[in-house]
UniProtKB/Swiss-Prot annotation:
Signal peptide: none annotated. Substrate binds at T77, S94, P95, N96, G97, T98, I99, R100, R109, R132, K212. The lineage of its organism: Eukaryota, Metazoa, Chordata, Craniata, Vertebrata. Catalyzes the NADP(+)-dependent oxidative decarboxylation of isocitrate (D-threo-isocitrate) to 2-ketoglutarate (2-oxoglutarate), which is required by other enzymes such as the phytanoyl-CoA dioxygenase. Plays a critical role in the generation of NADPH, an important cofactor in many biosynthesis pathways. May act as a corneal epithelial crystallin and may be involved in maintaining corneal epithelial transparency. This is Isocitrate dehydrogenase [NADP] cytoplasmic. The modification N6-succinyllysine is found at K126, K400. NADP(+) binds at T75, I76, T77, R82, K260, G310, T311, V312, T313, R314, H315, N328. The modification Phosphoserine is found at S389.
Length: 414
């Protein structure tokens, strides 16, 4: 490869701790030597978020809206300890949540699979991509303890002043209990549906929506109906052209089906189900260090990619003391590759598309050739049995990936 590939506009968000160090290494060794990017950089490190009163996070989200592609490093979401550690002005919200609220869209998690890394669910040979509808339901519910006997009712008061409607939830006759009122909005469910259909089309895999509409006939039934209506009107012919399909499944049936399957599908989950199943599926594949997270907006055009893990604080503390670390960079590299692949699709850029694919192949081929970080060696041998010769440290592994990428691209006729 003799010349740099022209890559176009990408919004890049720097993060915190060990992942911030890895992020810079990825740019320096794997991206910028080969791709000429119009980079719009935003420092989402906790100190800068504090200094800008979190305005930098909002600015980054607006930039993603404008340029359609964002790649994000893992960031600290502060708790009380972090507020004290960094002497923060306040406990700033999760940057991921802020960005998601501005962009809308659905977060899809996907495992990165290597043949030599054992999976807890051995039958999963292809990824299962989980899309979580991260809005409403239990997460925006009003719940309370019922102090004693009495009635719990839900009332809807129309804005136009017409007749109120009241429903009896439960009559507490002996003692109290607990009660909850939760909601969702058609617009949010519609956006969730569009993002899910767009994801299925981009991967060329079937899509399943899981609900419990047999019990929550009106509530979950609404999800089922909206998905079906949008599919029939706007996506059915595109799905059939790709020989893929959309189906609604009951959540219990879907969980059992997923366990028996070989993977290779998109699973659209309601908020709580997605929260639970995404972690369950991640563990089934073996490692959160090998899990990507992509936010897809309903327009199918705007995408933000990141690793599904945190900032690897424990390794950062070791690094600060000058101790050796072996931190897995793969999910962070895939944030870049997925972002660049999307940029390539938008711009019809075959060279950039080839590069993004080559970068992912190099990561998998390097691990399958036996060069890996300590966490992956532990997946294979069990942590107590891992010796120093079984793995590379953070910087050695990045160098190895850099060397292998250089060799792969040298063979390519670009």
């Amino acid at each position: 490869m003799s010349k740099k590939i022209h890559g176009g506009s990408v919004v890049e968000m720097q993060g915190d701790e060990m992942t911030r160090i890895i992020w810079e290494l990825i740019k320096e060794k794997l991206i910028l030597p080969y791709v000429e990017l119009d980079l719009h950089s935003y420092d989402l490190g906790i100190e800068n978020r504090d200094a800008t009163n979190d305005q930098v996070t909002k600015d980054a989200a607006e930039a993603i809206k404008k340029y359609n592609v964002g790649v994000k490093c893992a960031t600290i979401t502060p708790d009380e300890k972090r507020v004290e550690e960094f002497k923060l002005k306040q406990m700033w919200k999760s940057p991921n949540g802020t960005i998601r609220n501005i962009l809308g869209g659905t977060v899809f998690r996907e495992a990165i699979i290597c043949k030599n890394i054992p999976r807890l669910v051995t039958g999963w040979v292809k990824p299962i991509i989980i899309g979580r509808h991260a809005y409403g339901d239990q997460y925006r519910a009003t719940d309370f303890v019922v102090p004693g006997p009495g009635k719990v009712e839900i009332t809807f008061t129309p804005k136009d002043g017409s007749q109120k409607v009241t429903y009896l939830v439960h009559s507490f006759e002996e003692g109290g209990g607990v009660a909850m009122g939760m909601y969702n909005q058609d617009k949010s469910i519609e956006d969730f549906a569009h993002s899910s259909f767009q994801m299925a089309l981009s991967k060329g895999w079937p899509l399943y929506l899981s609900t419990k509409n047999t019990i929550l006939k009106k509530y979950d039934g609404r999800f089922k109906d909206i998905f079906q209506e949008i599919y029939d009107k706007q996506y059915k012919s595109q799905f059939e052209a790709q020989k893929i399909w959309y189906e609604h499944r009951l959540i219990d049936d879907m969980v059992a089906q997923a366990m028996k399957s070989e993977g290779g599908f998109i699973w659209a989950c309601k908020n709580y189900d997605g929260d639970v199943q995404s972690d369950s599926v991640a563990q089934g594949y073996g490692s959160l260090g090998m899990m990507t997270s992509v936010l897809i907006c309903p327009d199918g055009k705007t995408v933000e990619a990141e690793a599904a893990h945190g900032t690897v604080t424990r390794h950062y503390r070791m690094h600060q003391k000058g101790q050796e670390t072996s931190t897995n960079p793969i999910a962070s590299i895939f944030a870049w590759s997925r972002g660049l692949a999307h940029r390539a699709r938008l711009d019809n850029n075959t060279e950039l598309s080839f590069f993004a694919k080559a970068l992912e192949e190099v990561c998998i081929e390097t691990i399958e050739a036996g060069f890996m970080t300590k966490d992956l060696a532990a997946c294979i041998k069990g942590l107590p049995n891992v010796q120093r010769s079984d793995y590379l440290n953070t910087f050695e592994f990045m160098d190895k990936l850099g060397e292998n990428l250089k060799a792969k691209l040298a063979q390519a006729k670009l």
